[in-house]
């Protein structure tokens, strides 16, 4: 799998993620004869080959630069072409933890979509695990099939993923009774697919499920379906992830604030005088008199400016954060552009048959 192997340098044929800005990452297929163009200029692929991943690469015009990063599921989530709404990394991390997806886990995913979750699961379960993912939309299925083959995720190219074009709500899941350890449903009506899972849950150990739904009404329907079919430990979680940045804020004293107000007032008065002078010049019909008046007024203006500039002007130069010549205090600021919550997460557990029978006999 492309996303599970790591190397130091860019090679011809690689899939890379180009970092153009904080919120702008795009996938690039490195081909020696191609050139990538953006607002900073041209970036020939031939000059990228041999560079280290993470190295700064300047445009031919030296007007800007990009970074080439080796793709990971986390970076791919930020760079992938959106075919549907996607699952972001904060939700993916919690789903992995609650479903206990680890190396060697067998997972069913219904609703491949843009395959953000598929890439993360495939990387986690490794070569000993299996991902059975289903997509009912024909066009999205074909796009995902090509993408998975290029990323070496499919079973027929040495990967661990089975991709199937199927409407699981109507036709169920696999034709064979494959047992899985975890189930992830990203469907408009997951409660219609839940009854079809009975042939695929383990009877000798627990099987865990997550339903990913944007509306609380969908969660209610899914919870009722799970409860009726004997699933337990049903809970809903909403991930409200925030990233806080530690910064320093300059302490401004009252004297400095007063000086700044005086400076603003002085500039406003000067601007008024200049506008007044231009109006008088426009009204003058005698050019010679106009010039004389202009000279005298400029002289008066200069004298007034020299008098008022006796006040210490407030500097407009940029002050570097943490400059030792100023006083600073530590503050924190939340990143408002962070992509996290998109839906509610409904979790449940299906107990092994023997343990479930014991629980029913003993009662609550």
Swiss-Prot record:
Role summary: Catalytic subunit of tRNA (adenine-N(1)-)-methyltransferase, which catalyzes the formation of N(1)-methyladenine at position 58 (m1A58) in initiator methionyl-tRNA.
Residues that coordinate or bind S-adenosyl-L-methionine: 114-116, 135, 140, 167-168, 186
Enzyme Commission code(s) on record: 2.1.1.220
GO cellular component, one term: nucleus
Protein name, entry field: tRNA (adenine(58)-N(1))-methyltransferase catalytic subunit trm61
Chief location bin: nucleus
Reaction(s) catalysed (UniProt annotation): adenosine(58) in tRNA + S-adenosyl-L-methionine = N(1)-methyladenosine(58) in tRNA + S-adenosyl-L-homocysteine + H(+)
Assembly description: Heterotetramer; composed of two copies of TRM6 and two copies of TRM61.
Source organism phylogeny: Eukaryota, Fungi, Dikarya, Ascomycota, Taphrinomycotina
PANTHER family membership: TRNA (ADENINE(58)-N(1))-METHYLTRANSFERASE, TRNA (ADENINE(58)-N(1))-METHYLTRANSFERASE CATALYTIC SUBUNIT TRMT61A
Family per record: Belongs to the class I-like SAM-binding methyltransferase superfamily. TRM61 family.
Enzyme class: transferase
Subcellular location: Nucleus
